[in-house]
C-alpha cells in the first residue's frame, strides 16, 4: 500500500516508469491482426528475397538497354620481336539496324522485371496468409484451452454431487470412480490443448518477432459478397498470380522475336584504329565502314531456336489460361466450403444450447435420484465435443475469407478493411 501511495499524484508516464523500475509487469496493448501482419512482413526473409530479385531484374533491364549504345573492343601490347614497340587494335561499333533484336532483349528483361514484381506481391500475400493462419491458430488454441477448463469445472461439480450422494448412502463408489475417470481424461485433454497452444505461440513469435498477447479476434467482411458485386473476371485478371503468369508469357513472346532477329544480319557502323607491323615496319591505320554481322552458325541449331521459343510461348500462354481457371476454381471451392461450415456452425450452436438445457434437467433429476452419473457425464461430454467443434468451425470460416482474398491479391485490403470502400 505504501508503494501505491507514492504513485498517487504523479503523472501517468512517471507512474509507468516507476512500475517498470519496481519490476511490476504492465499489460501489453492489444495487437490486431493487421498490425501483426505488418510486423511479420517487415522481417520475413522470403519477402525480402523476392524484393531483391525484383531489384536485380531492374538492373538487368538497364543492362539490356546497353545494346543501343556503341561497343568498344581494344587490345594492345608489345611487338613480338621488339619489346620497345607497342601495337594495338581499337574498334568502336554502333548498331544501326538489328531487326528488333536489342528491343526484344529489352522487352524480355522488362517483362521479367514485371513478372518478379508480381512475384513480390505473391510472396507477400503468402507470407501474410501464413501469419494470419498462425494468428488464428493462437486464438483457436486459447479458446479450446478455456473450453476444457470450463468442462473440468462442470465435471468437478458432478464429482462433488456424486460424493455427496455416496456419503448419504444413495450410491456406491463406482459412480465416484466413474466421475474421477472422466475428470482424468479431461485433465489429459487440457495438457494436450496447452501443448498445442504453446506450439502456436512459438510459431507466432517466430513469424511476427514478438510474443502473442491480447490478440483480437478479427471480423473480416464476406469476400464472396464483395466479389458478387464486382467484376470477378477483372478481379482475377488483376490478381498477382494471374499477372505473373501473363508476364511470363510476355517474356516468352519477346524471346521469340529475339530468336527470329538473331537469324538476320545486323548492320553496324564500325570505326577501327590500329597499329601493326607491315613489311617489317610498324604502321598506323584507321578505317570506318558499314558492316553486316551475323551470329556463328552451328549446324541447324540457330534455325531451331525460334521453334523452341515459339513452343515455350505456347506453353506459357496455356499456363496463364490454366492459372485463371485455377483461381476461379479455388475461389468456388473455398466459398462452397464456407457455406457448408456456416450450416454446420448453426447446427452445432443449436446442439450446444440443447446440451446445456439437457444438462440442467439431468442435474435436477440426478439430485432426486432419477438419473445416474453416467447420464450426466455423457451429456457433458457431448456438450464439450460440440463446443470444441464449434470453435474450430468458427475460426475456419475466418480462414476461408483470408485464403480467398490471398488468391486474388486482396488480402491486404481485407486486413485493412478497405474493401468496404470499393477497393
Label each residue range with its predicted role.
Residues 1-11:
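N-terminal secretory signal peptides that target proteins for export/translocation
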Residues 28-77, 96, 104, 170-173, ...:
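Bacterial Sec-pathway N-terminal export signals of envelope proteins
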Residues 79, 83-85, 188-191, 195, ...:
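Outer-membrane beta-barrel domain signature
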Residues 15-25:
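Bacterial N-terminal signal peptides
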Residues 5, 31, 126-240, 248, ...:
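Periplasmic alpha-helical coiled-coil/stalk elements that build and connect Gram-negative outer-membrane
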Residues 49-64, 123-152, 157-160, 164, ...:
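Amphipathic alpha-helical coiled-coil segments
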Residues 32, 71-123, 243-255, 260-323, ...:
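Small/polar-residue-enriched beta-strand and adjacent coil segments characteristic
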Amino acid at each position: 500500500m505504501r508503494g501505491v501511495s507514492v504513485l498517487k499524484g504523479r503523472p501517468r508516464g512517471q507512474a509507468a516508469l516507476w512500475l517498470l523500475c519496481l519490476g511490476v509487469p504492465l499489460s501489453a496493448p492489444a495487437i490486431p491482426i493487421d498490425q501483426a501482419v505488418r510486423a511479420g512482413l517487415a522481417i520475413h526473409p522470403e519477402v525480402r528475397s523476392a524484393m531483391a530479385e525484383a531489384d536485380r531484374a531492374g538492373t538487368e533491364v538497364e543492362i539490356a538497354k546497353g545494346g543501343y549504345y556503341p561497343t568498344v573492343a581494344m587490345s594492345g601490347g608489345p611487338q613480338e620481336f621488339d619489346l620497345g614497340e607497342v601495337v594495338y587494335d581499337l574498334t568502336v561499333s554502333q548498331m544501326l539496324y538489328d531487326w528488333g533484336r536489342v528491343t526484344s532483349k529489352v522487352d524480355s528483361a522488362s517483362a521479367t522485371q514485371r513478372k518478379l514484381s508480381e512475384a513480390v506481391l505473391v510472396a507477400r500475400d503468402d507470407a501474410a496468409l501464413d501469419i494470419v493462419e498462425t494468428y488464428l491458430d493462437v486464438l483457436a488454441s486459447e479458446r479450446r484451452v478455456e473450453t476444457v477448463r470450463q468442462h473440468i469445472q462442470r465435471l468437478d461439480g458432478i464429482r462433488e454431487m456424486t460424493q455427496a450422494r455416496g456419503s448419504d448412502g444413495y450410491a456406491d463408489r463406482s459412480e465416484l470412480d466413474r466421475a474421477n475417470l472422466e475428470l482424468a481424461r479431461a485433465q489429459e485433454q487440457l495438457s494436450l490443448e496447452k501443448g498445442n497452444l504453446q506450439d502456436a505461440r512459438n510459431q507466432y513469435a517466430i513469424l511476427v518477432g514478438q510474443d502473442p498477447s491480447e490478440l483480437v479476434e478479427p471480423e473480416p467482411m464476406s469476400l464472396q459478397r464483395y466479389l458478387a458485386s464486382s467484376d470477378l473476371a477483372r478481379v482475377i485478371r488483376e490478381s498477382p498470380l494471374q499477372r505473373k503468369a501473363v508476364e511470363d508469357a510476355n517474356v516468352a513472346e519477346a524471346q521469340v522475336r529475339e530468336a527470329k532477329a538473331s537469324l538476320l544480319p545486323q548492320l553496324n557502323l564500325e570505326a577501327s584504329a590500329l597499329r601493326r607491323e607491315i613489311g617489317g615496319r610498324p604502321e598506323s591505320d584507321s578505317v570506318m565502314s558499314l558492316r553486316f554481322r551475323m551470329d556463328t552458325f552451328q549446324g541447324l541449331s540457330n534455325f531451331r531456336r525460334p521453334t523452341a521459343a515459339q513452343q515455350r510461348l505456347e506453353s506459357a500462354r496455356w499456363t496463364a489460361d490454366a492459372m485463371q481457371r485455377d483461381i476461379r476454381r479455388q475461389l468456388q471451392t473455398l466459398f462452397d466450403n464456407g457455406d457448408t461450415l456456416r450450416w454446420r456452425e448453426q447446427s452445432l450452436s443449436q446442439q450446444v444450447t440443447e446440451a446445456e438445457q439437457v444438462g440442467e434437467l439431468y442435474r435436477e433429476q440426478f439430485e432426486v435420484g432419477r438419473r445416474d452419473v453416467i447420464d450426466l457425464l455423457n451429456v457433458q461430454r457431448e456438450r464439450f465435443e460440440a463446443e470444441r467443434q464449434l470453435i474450430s468451425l468458427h475460426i475456419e470460416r475466418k480462414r476461408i475469407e483470408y485464403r480467398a482474398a490471398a488468391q486474388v491479391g486482396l488480402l491486404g485490403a481485407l486486413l485493412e478493411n478497405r474493401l468496404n470502400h470499393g477497393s
